[in-house]
């Protein structure tokens, strides 16, 4: 007669373990989405570097040496910039797809929510304007910094 009681305990233990695993995984899911998105952005920037000569040569505000906790703000400055294809050649469609990928919002994070409270970050207009190649290098550097901070 004791067997059903033990079986119930085992089933309950397994359910607790399973639900704890699911809860643990879902709490990290948003973080994983951010990391995946940031790594995709690195690839996108690298691809855009191949088309530097096909982009409008306009000088663009490019954040550098971004203060800690101002990364999201600086990233949004990069996203607000109007990157444009310089010609209507074969590469225009590819460039436009890459630019759209850069403009997609990042998944929400706790750090992003904290940043909105009480921290004063530089405005987009305050950043020095740079040629497109340096703009892309600084964007990549910022994304790498965001990945590093996310992992630490």
UniProtKB/Swiss-Prot annotation:
What GO biological process terms are annotated to this protein in UniProt? cellular response to virus; germinal center B cell differentiation; positive regulation of cytokine production; positive regulation of immunoglobulin production; positive regulation of natural killer cell mediated cytotoxicity; T follicular helper cell differentiation
Q: Which domain of life is it from?
A: Eukaryota
> Which Gene3D superfamilies does the UniProt record give?
Interleukin-15/Interleukin-21
Which GO cellular component terms are attached? extracellular space
Q: Which InterPro entries match?
A: 4_helix_cytokine-like_core, IL-15/IL-21_fam
Disulfide bond entries: 70-121, 77-124
Annotated GO MF terms: cytokine activity; cytokine receptor binding
Which compartments is it annotated to reside in?
A: Secreted
Q: What is its main location?
A: secreted
Keywords from UniProt, A to Z, are: Cytokine, Disulfide bond, Secreted, Signal
Which Pfam families is this protein grouped with?
IL15
Signal peptide span? 1-23
What role does it play? Cytokine with immunoregulatory activity. May promote the transition between innate and adaptive immunity. Induces the production of IgG(1) and IgG(3) in B-cells. Implicated in the generation and maintenance of T follicular helper (Tfh) cells and the formation of germinal-centers. Together with IL6, control the early generation of Tfh cells and are critical for an effective antibody response to acute viral infection. May play a role in proliferation and maturation of natural killer (NK) cells in synergy with IL15.
Q: Which family does it belong to?
A: Belongs to the IL-15/IL-21 family.
**PANTHER family (UniProt xref):** INTERLEUKIN-15-RELATED, INTERLEUKIN-21
- Protein name in UniProt: Interleukin-21
């Amino acid at each position: 007669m004791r067997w059903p009681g033990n079986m119930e305990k085992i089933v309950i233990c397994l359910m607790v373990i399973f639900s704890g695993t699911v809860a643990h995984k879902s709490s990290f899911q948003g973080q994983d989405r951010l990391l995946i998105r940031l790594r995709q952005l690195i690839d996108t920037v690298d691809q855009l570097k191949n088309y530097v000569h096909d982009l409008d040569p306009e000088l663009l505000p490019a954040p550098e040496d971004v203060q800690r906790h101002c990364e999201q703000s600086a990233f949004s400055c990069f996203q607000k910039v109007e990157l444009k294809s310089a010609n209507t050649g074969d590469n225009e469609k590819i460039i436009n797809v890459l630019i759209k990928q850069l403009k997609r919002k990042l998944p929400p994070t706790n750090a992003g929510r904290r940043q909105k409270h009480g921290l004063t970050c530089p405005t987009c207009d305050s950043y020095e304007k740079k040629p497109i190649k340096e703009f892309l290098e600084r964007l990549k550097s910022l994304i790498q910094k965001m990945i590093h901070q996310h992992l630490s």
